[in-house]
Amino acid sequence: MNTCIQLLILCLVTLTNSENLTDISTETTIENEKEDVTETELLETIENETETVTETELPETIGTEIPAEALNLPQSPKQKYCKSEGQYCSRTIFHRCCGNLVCQLHGFFNGTCVQCLAERKFCIWSSECCSKRCRLFRCRKNPYVQVIPY
């Protein structure tokens, strides 16, 4: 145990000494370089390395383009997070349809907002179906609605 501590102390002392030597040698090198450089050489170097800064050129379209975010914003603040007809929806609170629109799913959490669901489409509530009849999670024909020929 004592030998481990002694070795650790020896390593720390060696590391500290080597850092001090490196700092001293770096400082002397910098001082020697400072003495060798004259003021005119320094000014010439600064002029050569400095670029002339010109006015930044903006693209011509920046004034006429409307940001994409502005185009997708809903009309009222109440509809901030809902989608309009034809847009992507997922039947979650994050991607839901506005108003009376319903989400017609095409895959797992992947759908489109429509007015109502057609026959044999996945449904949860009868109000989602155009026929107003949802049975076993599918929109069905409504047998109570009959077309009367004239």
From Swiss-Prot:
Disulfide bond residue pairs: C116-C130, C123-C134, C129-C139
Top-rank taxon: Eukaryota
GO cellular component assignments: extracellular region
Manganese keyword on record: no
InterPro entries noted in UniProt: UPF0506 (IPR021712)
Position of the signal peptide: 1-18
Annotated compartments: Secreted
Similarity field: Belongs to the UPF0506 family.
The record's note on its domains: The presence of a 'disulfide through disulfide knot' structurally defines this protein as a knottin.
Record protein name field: UPF0506 protein SJCHGC03047
